[in-house]
From Swiss-Prot:
Compartments, record wording: Cytoplasm
Role: Capsid protein (CA) is the structural component of the virus-like particle (VLP), forming the shell that encapsulates the retrotransposons dimeric RNA genome. The particles are assembled from trimer-clustered units and there are holes in the capsid shells that allow for the diffusion of macromolecules. CA also has nucleocapsid-like chaperone activity, promoting primer tRNA(i)-Met annealing to the multipartite primer-binding site (PBS), dimerization of Ty2 RNA and initiation of reverse transcription.
Disordered: region residues: 1-88, 365-397, 419-438
Record site feature (Cleavage), residues: 397-398
GO cellular component: cytoplasm
InterPro entries linked: TYA (IPR015820)
Note: Retrotransposons are mobile genetic entities that are able to replicate via an RNA intermediate and a reverse transcription step. In contrast to retroviruses, retrotransposons are non-infectious, lack an envelope and remain intracellular. Ty2 retrotransposons belong to the copia elements (pseudoviridae).
Chain residue ranges for the region called RNA-binding: 295-397
Entry comment, domain topic: The C-terminal RNA-binding region of CA is sufficient for all its nucleocapsid-like chaperone activities.
Protein's UniProt name: Transposon Ty2-OR2 Gag polyprotein
Domain of life: Eukaryota
Quaternary structure (record): Homotrimer.
BP terms from Gene Ontology: viral translational frameshifting
Origin species: Saccharomyces cerevisiae (strain ATCC 204508 / S288c) (Baker's yeast)
Length: 438
């Protein structure tokens, strides 16, 4: 018969008992624990004082009979009640379904008291096997090769999430949420979840599944702490703590608004006007841009608007730059009024151009031909005569009268008649009388 001797291990923090078997025989009716404290070694006494709670060791019959030395077997010890993380108000590893989080302070153990206001998504029926994209997180970082083997055994949902996707950086400030959400949306797209994210028009290709909803909620919660979210995001999550899709929809809408703001600023900085379009159209275009920026809480002062408009003026409107260069109090309405005035003046001048061309055509040269000459002779006349000039017919009559009185005193000429008159040159007439002798 073999005997047992109980030794307390001073290095065990929870009083684990080890049973060792020796070859020395003891009477079978002796209780191995019925040993006085004086007979114990000194180090065993100290161990007995320190360890107030001891676990019962198995009886003599529980030790197998073996004449050889048996290796000590540690007894089961309950884990400590107070660990490193408190379990109240935290996600358990079985509830976390995130990707590659072990390197980001183990978000499965992060506090999320602001989000967990309802057990709708994280306390399912225990008989319902919740499929996961990846295995639950552990306290140690998994080996990359082992993690790939584990991923292959996990049942996949409708959309297969890509492994080894780089997570987004943690959200750090309320002002940078619009920038952070771009990285978060890119992270979801790289995880093959881009078809459940709303596009620029707010439309989605399909409805997300329960597992995808939980996956998006976990990732958003882990990397965007509640106290760092903007006010409008907090208002949405206070109504429905898991409505991350609405947050994404409004974020995309705000992105489009920001893009429109950028386009409006570019259009306002590149304004050009030379009078090719009406002044009213130009005023409406500029006013629409300024009003749209004002609706987005961006106020454009009159001075800034006038400076941008003056920079783009050209042609007849360019002189307004010098006029407004020394002005300190610029009014946008006054600038539009002066642009309208110059446009109207140019329009009136353009309407008068055809009548001026018609008056100028009256001064053009007019040709006239002589019918009685063999060779056509072209004469040039001006229709606008002076008051001192006389008609050509009156000149011819005066010349004929004077020649008649000169022939009366001539005795050799009995009768004379003018048979024909020819135009010899441009300024005077020549008479060729024909005389008949009896």
């Amino acid at each position: 018969m073999e005997s047992q001797q109980l030794h307390q291990n001073p290095h065990c923090p929870h009083g684990s008992a080890y049973a060792s078997v020796t070859s020395k025989e003891v009477p079978s009716n002796q209780d191995p624990l019925a040993v006085s404290a004086s007979n114990l070694p000194e180090f065993d006494r100290d161990s007995t004082k320190v360890n107030s709670q001891e676990e019962t060791t198995p009886g003599t019959s529980a030790v197998p009979e073996n004449h050889h030395h048996v290796s000590p077997q540690p007894a089961s010890v309950p884990p400590p009640q107070n660990g490193q993380y408190q379990q109240h108000g935290m996600m358990t590893p079985n509830k976390a379904m995130a990707s590659n989080w072990a390197h980001y302070q183990q978000p499965s153990m992060m506090t999320c008291s602001h989000y967990q206001t309802s057990p709708a998504y994280y306390q399912p029926d225990p008989h319902y096997p919740l499929p996961q994209y990846i295995p639950p997180l552990s306290t140690s970082s998994p080996d990359p090769i082992d993690s790939q083997d584990q991923h292959s055994e996990v049942p996949q949902a409708k959309t297969k999430v890509r492994n080894n996707v780089l997570p987004p950086h943690p959200h750090t400030s309320e002002e940078n949420f619009s920038t952070w959400v771009k990285f978060y949306i890119r992270f979801l797209k790289n995880s093959n979840l881009g078809d459940i994210i709303p596009n620029d028009q707010g439309e989605i290709k399909r409805q997300m599944t329960y597992e995808e909803h939980a996956y998006i909620y976990n990732t958003f919660q882990a990397f965007a702490p509640f106290h760092l979210l903007p006010t409008w995001v907090k208002q949405i999550l206070e109504i429905n703590y898991s409505d991350i899709l609405t947050v994404l929809c409004k974020s995309v809408s705000k992105m489009q608004t920001n893009n429109q703001e950028l386009k409006d600023w570019i259009a306002l900085a590149n304004l050009e006007y030379n009078g090719s379009t009406s002044a009213d159209t130009f005023e409406i275009t500029v006013s629409t841009i300024i009003q749209r920026l004002k609706e987005n809480n961006i106020n454009v002062s009159d001075r800034l608007a006038c400076q941008l408009i003056l920079k783009g003026l050209s042609g007849d409107f360019k002189y307004l730059r010098n006029q407004y260069r020394t002005k300190t109090n610029m009014k946008l309405s006054q600038l539009f009024a002066e642009i309208q005035l110059i446009y109207d003046e140019n329009k009136i001048m353009n309407l008068n151009k055809p009548s001026q061309y018609k008056q100028h055509s009256e001064y053009k040269n007019v040709s006239r031909t002589s019918p009685n000459t063999t060779n056509t002779k072209v004469t040039t006349r001006n229709y606008h005569r002076t008051n001192s000039s006389k008609p050509r017919a009156a000149k011819a009559h005066n010349i004929a009268t004077s020649s008649k009185f000169s022939r009366v005193n001539n005795d050799h000429i009995n009768e004379s008649t003018v048979s024909s008159q020819y135009l010899s040159d441009d300024n005077e007439l020549s008479l060729r009388p024909a005389t008949e002798r009896i």
